[in-house]
Regions:
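Predominantly the C-terminal beta-signal and adjacent terminal strand-loop region
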Residues: 81-82, 86, 90, 174-220
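Short glycine/proline- and aromatic-enriched beta-strand/turn motifs that initiate or cap beta-hairpins
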Residues: 19-71, 139, 211, 217-219
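Cleavable N-terminal export/targeting peptides
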Residues: 1-26
Length: 220
């Protein structure tokens, strides 16, 4: 999947640059909000000399995004910033475990997307995009109890990971230079290690989420 995303993005760039000589640039600003459906988070830690696998069950969460783009004919290149909080409500481990507080992640993404618009005669424009960038993930310390007898601290940390995504959406022009859009995004976040002095290191696997956003776009 990662190779496909990188390859697709690289293929979009020459087509985008080739259009520069044919049309004057048009910048745009997009603002959107919606919901994120994150997959459960998997990780592992060593507690008292024993390795334990953990699964954190996630909930729906809010997600917000701002994009600044450059449009040339049917192609667009966009820098996109999005932010959201991933919240969990349960931990499942090899043995009976509990954790306080529940794992929460503050996730901020900084992505570069290439888009292809499928323009027709109507005001409706479907589009597809692929992007790559980085995401920062912040977590707090948690107290974890194993079989209600052994108590440890899982390390919270701030990490920066590689991220890539796929988008598909529909844009509807409401007046000249202004449109509304709805889009779905699949985004993957790389694995990382949360570690801190005096706490147990947690190895988090790569994770992903699907986001549905609705917003408005201004061309200028």
């Amino acid at each position: 999947m990662k190779k496909f995303l990188i390859g697709t993005t690289l293929l979009l760039i020459p087509s985008f640059l080739g259009a520069i000589a044919e049309e004057t640039s048009r910048y745009y600003l997009s603002i959107g909000g919606g919901i994120a459906l994150p997959n459960d988070i998997d990780g592992d830690s060593n507690l008292g000399g024993t390795n334990y696998d953990h699964k954190f069950s996630t909930n729906l969460s809010d997600n917000y995004a701002v994009g600044l783009g450059y449009k040339l004919k049917d192609w667009r290149l966009e820098f996109n910033y999005s932010t959201g909080k991933v919240q969990t409500d349960k931990i499942t481990s090899n043995v009976r475990s509990s954790i306080v507080p529940n794992l929460k992640r503050d996730v901020n993404s900084y992505m570069a997307y290439g888009y292809k618009d499928f323009n027709g005669e109507s005001k409706v424009t479907p589009y597809f995009g692929a992007g790559i960038g980085i995401a920062t993930i912040s977590t707090e310390d948690q107290k974890i109890s194993v079989v209600n007898a052994f108590h440890y601290t899982h390390a919270g940390d701030d990490a920066t990971v590689l991220s890539y995504g796929l988008k598909a959406g529909i844009d509807y022009e409401i007046v000249d230079n202004t449109s509304i859009f709805t889009e779905g995004t699949y985004q993957n976040f790389g694995s990382y290690k949360a570690e801190k002095s005096g706490a147990r290191t947690v190895n988090y696997d790569a994770s992903s989420q699907f986001t549905i956003l609705t917003g408005i776009k201004f061309n200028f």
